[in-house]
Curated annotation (Swiss-Prot):
GO terms for molecular function: DNA binding; DNA ligase (NAD+) activity; metal ion binding. Its cofactor is Mg(2+); Mn(2+). This is DNA ligase. GO terms for biological process: DNA repair; DNA replication. It comes from the Bacteria. DNA ligase that catalyzes the formation of phosphodiester linkages between 5'-phosphoryl and 3'-hydroxyl groups in double-stranded DNA using NAD as a coenzyme and as the energy source for the reaction. It is essential for DNA replication and repair of damaged DNA. It catalyses: NAD(+) + (deoxyribonucleotide)n-3'-hydroxyl + 5'-phospho-(deoxyribonucleotide)m = (deoxyribonucleotide)n+m + AMP + beta-nicotinamide D-nucleotide. The keyword Zinc applies. The active site is at residue 118. The keyword Manganese applies. It holds the Pfam family HHH_5. CDD domains: LIGANc. The gene is ligA. Keywords: DNA damage, DNA repair, DNA replication, Ligase, Magnesium, Manganese, Metal-binding, NAD, Zinc.
Length: 668
């Protein structure tokens, strides 16, 4: 952690994560929301903002490391062939131009951008084999989603069989399902007549429709679909990929533009910011991408976002409301987070009743007081936040807010390190910290039945202090708790037993290592097939993984260096948790001990297929060329990585030579 990050901000960030994990688990997994969408979105935006301003705060357990909801138990969970990354957001033209200028410096002349409308719906993955739709799924957490093939077949804009004479053997299509505004109004009118709860907005209506168990309900609603990218196709640019999708019978949004500089990008964004309400569907921004795929490969990914794309969000809608109270919540890292409780107000389609105030500094800088009239804004038309106080409307009885000097959970005197913003509870046994860790574990391992209320009771009774303690609970102990009963207790014990079958990657995610989210945990588990192997790995070995870096690697190394964490692993192992498995099964060891970098466009293999080929024979693929690189596999339009390999005298192979190397284990 950088010393430049104020402690109060660090602590507040941890608090936000704990809240969002609990709320997200209740909403997406249990289908039993504890708070409104507006409250969740409000806190999520605050976390996005903090992690954007302080990249050091990005944590493996952060909800922003997810790219969507966890699959519900009513649907079959499927693994995406290609992970569905979320996009970094730009909330101003300045942020957008900063992103573009960074890419211009990295790539140089010839860089082109493509602008596409960001449809406000549900991201969807479609899999075609030999031109036939074989599977459709929700985005889920980006690695796994829910199979909803039957529901997606009812959407007329999705071809069941690809058009065109020449179709690829395998095609992965990504797109956005959505509900037009007029259809949204019709659906809500029907629900109102039937006495059912109304959908808050078209986006929520679309998500709820796609998760219907009865596909006849989906068919009765007029959903639309725009395809926006494809994998394993023949295109060499995003512009060509969209044309290829159209040739196969997909509906592609016609409002797109190929831009040769940032000025053209700005013009496109400004136009649709002013004219978006003329469209028959909702759009909450513009997606800007680097057009050429070789340029996309050159700049690569962060652990969560592609560096070559960004979502420009339209300026937010603002409303005024009154602060009725200011509550302070304690996160699992001990940070105290103040939250403004508001008179409910509708902002951009959802009802906002709570707004985060981030930290003590934020309250003091805004001078927010109970009774104040404040401006609420939904940044990107999704996430609400308090922008400012309307001082002229302040009631005479309003007094400055005094931040608590003791933890509201345990009474310990709070601390604030010099130069940091976070006010923290320093007590490692604070019930709030323990509850947060337990909640994250149960969400990560999909343990049903152990919600916030039960966790609070277990902690208050002293029955549970760590996640390992959960596995020492008996049905008799649980049944003795008020309002639980023998049947519920037995189900909880059964759920804990079932969590033993969760893979090593999910256990790793549940441990809550900093910067190691769900998708990163999958990659780590593939590269290091056991906790012991990961514990033995050094900084360089972890940092060399594709898409990783020193910051992620250091988080892993430091976590495994702590004795209490190693002791926790031993206890979990003794309880039967999966601390091994999940590595890619090797067809041979022909490439064992060799490290590869892939650059350019290969004749027959996509980058993903080439990576899988190398790893299936024991090799390792990294994203950057160094003196430790064994071979660079280069295709057409190979960029700076090829030049780097030549400078370092690293051997360069083409696709044919790579295959020969596998067969003979000798340089051809």
């Amino acid at each position: 952690m950088s010393t430049t990050v104020p402690p109060e901000i660090e602590e507040h960030t941890r608090t936000l994560r704990a809240l969002l994990h609990r709320w997200g688990y209740a909403y997406y997994v249990l289908d039993a929301p504890e708070v409104s969408d507006a409250i969740y979105d409000q806190h999520y935006r605050e976390l996005v903002d903090l992690e954007s301003r302080y990249p050091e705060l990005v944590s493996p357990d952060s909800p922003t490391r997810r790219v969507g909801e966890r699959p519900a138990s009513a649907f079959v969970s499927v693994t995406h062939r290609v992970p569905m990354f979320s996009l970094e957001n730009a909330f101003s033209q300045a942020e957008l131009e900063k992103w573009g200028e960074r890419l211009l410096r990295a790539i140089g002349p010839g860089l082109e951008f493509i602008c596409e409308l960001k449809i406000d719906g549900s991201a969807t993955a479609l899999s075609y084999e030999d031109g036939v739709l074989v599977r459709g799924a929700t985005r889920g957490d980006g690695v796994e989603g829910e199979e909803i093939t039957q529901n997606l077949r009812t959407i007329r804009a999705i071809p069941l069989k690809l058009l065109g004479g020449e179709v690829p053997a395998v095609l992965e299509v990504r797109g956005e399902a959505f509900i037009p505004r007029d259809e949204f109004e019709r659906i809500n009118q029907e629900r109102q007549a039937a006495g059912e709860k109304l959908f808050a907005n078209p986006r929520n209506a679309c998500a709820g429709t796609l998760r219907q168990l009865d596909s006849r309900v989906v068919a009765s609603r007029r959903l639309g679909f725009f395809a926006y990218t494809a994998h394993y196709g023949r295109a060499e640019s995003q512009w060509e990929a969209l044309a290829e999708l159209e040739s196969h019978g997909f509906r592609v949004n016609p409002h797109r533009s190929l831009c040769r500089d940032l000025a053209e990008v700005r013009t496109f964004c400004e136009h649709w910011e002013n004219h978006r309400h003329e469209l028959p569907y909702d759009t909450d921004g513009v997606v800007v991408k680097v057009n050429a795929f070789d340029h996309q490969r050159e700049v690569g990914f962060t652990s969560k976002f592609p560096r070559w794309a960004i979502a420009f969000k339209y300026p937010a809608e603002e409303k005024s409301t009154v602060v009725e109270a200011i509550a302070v919540q304690v996160g699992r890292t001990g940070a105290l987070t103040p939250v403004a409780e508001l008179q409910p107000v509708a902002v951009a389609g959802t009802t906002v009743s709570r707004a985060t105030l981030h930290n003590q500094d934020r309250i003091e800088s805004l001078d927010v007081r109970v009774g104040d009239t404040v401006i609420i804004r939904k940044a990107g038309e999704i996430i609400p936040e308090v922008v400012r106080v309307i001082g002229e409307l302040r009631p005479p009885e309003a007094v400055p807010y005094v931040f608590p000097q003791t933890c509201p959970e345990c009474g310990t005197a709070v601390v604030r390190a010099p130069g940091e913003a976070a006010v923290r509870c320093p007590n490692p046994r604070c019930p709030a910290l323990i509850r947060g860790k337990l909640g994250h574990w149960c969400a990560a391992l999909e343990i049903d039945g152990i919600g916030d209320k039960l966790i609070a009771r277990l902690v208050s009774l002293g029955l549970v202090h760590t996640v390992a303690d959960l596995y020492e609970l008996s049905a008799e102990q649980l049944a003795g708790l008020e309002r639980l009963g023998a049947r519920s207790a037995a189900k909880i014990v059964e759920q804990l037993d079932r969590s033993h079958r969760q893979p090593w990657s999910r256990v790793l995610y549940g441990l809550g290592l900093r910067h190691i989210g769900a998708s990163v945990s999958v990659e780590l588990a593939r590269a290091f097939a056991s906790a012991d192997a990961l514990a033995r790995a050094d900084l360089a070995a972890i940092a060399s993984l594709y898409g990783f870096g020193e910051e992620l690697a250091r988080s892993v190394v430091e976590w495994f260096a702590q004795a209490e964490n190693r002791a926790l692993l031993e206890r979990l192992k003794a309880h039967g948790l999966q601390l091994a498995g999940g590595g890619r099964a090797a067809q041979s060891s022909a490439l064992a001990g060799l490290t590869f970098v892939i650059t350019g466009t290969l004749p027959t293999l996509s980058r993903e297929e080439c990576t899988a080929l190398i790893e299936s024979h024991g090799g390792k693929v990294t994203s950057s060329v160094s003196s430790r690189t064994s071979y660079v596999v280069a295709g057409e339009k190979a960029g700076s990585k090829l030049a780097r390999a030549q400078d370092l005298k690293v051997a360069v192979l083409d696709e044919e030579q790579l295959r020969a190397l596998i067969e003979t284990r000798e340089m051809p």
